[in-house]
């Protein structure tokens, strides 16, 4: 266990990790530009984290939820861009996003999620009343079930960001 600013720490070590976890930054009132102010959430930073993941390792990033969704979906979009920049053809196969009423957790796997991992993620979320917003193969009926929002904003956002018109959604 190392408690340090992740990007700076990882640039000083060649070691690979099974899990790299980034906690939510700032308070819930940090505002629209909260992620813009931190260099730990850039495409380049995410690539640094990927470079330090063990085979089948995970990057877990927590963020505060604001409505309409901002930071969680911006982070999801950044992860997609970072994965594509490393040559990953199907970023959605390596991503999962779950949420509670006030936080979300983005999981990025070094490799595609297995069926067993998806089953475990779904069961973990169900037992704790977390909503799933994305995992490979998610169906609309599995989103927005516990902490119900007016619309399944997070599910809709992740689908749009992974779809063919992602630039229209993010732009």
Q: Where are these predicted regions, by residue range?
A:
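Soluble catalytic regions of membrane-associated enzymes that act on cell-envelope
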Residues: 1-112
């Amino acid at each position: 266990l190392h408690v340090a600013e992740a990007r700076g720490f990882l640039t000083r070590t060649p070691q690979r990790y099974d899990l790299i976890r980034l906690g939510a930054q700032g308070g819930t009132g940090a505002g629209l530009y909260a992620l813009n102010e931190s260099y730990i959430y850039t495409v380049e930073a995410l690539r640094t984290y990927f470079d330090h993941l063990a085979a089948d390792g995970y990057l877990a990033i927590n963020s505060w939820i604001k409505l309409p969704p901002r930071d969680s979906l911006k982070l999801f979009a950044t992860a997609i861009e970072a994965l594509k920049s490393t040559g990953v053809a199907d970023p959605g196969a390596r991503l999962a996003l779950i949420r509670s009423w006030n936080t979300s957790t983005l999981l990025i796997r070094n490799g595609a999620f297995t069926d067993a991992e998806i089953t475990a993620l779904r069961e973990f979320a169900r037992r704790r009343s977390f909503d799933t917003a994305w995992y490979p193969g998610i169906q609309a009926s599995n989103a927005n079930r516990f902490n119900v929002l007016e619309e399944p904003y997070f599910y809709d956002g992740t689908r749009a960001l992974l779809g063919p018109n992602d630039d229209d959604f993010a732009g």
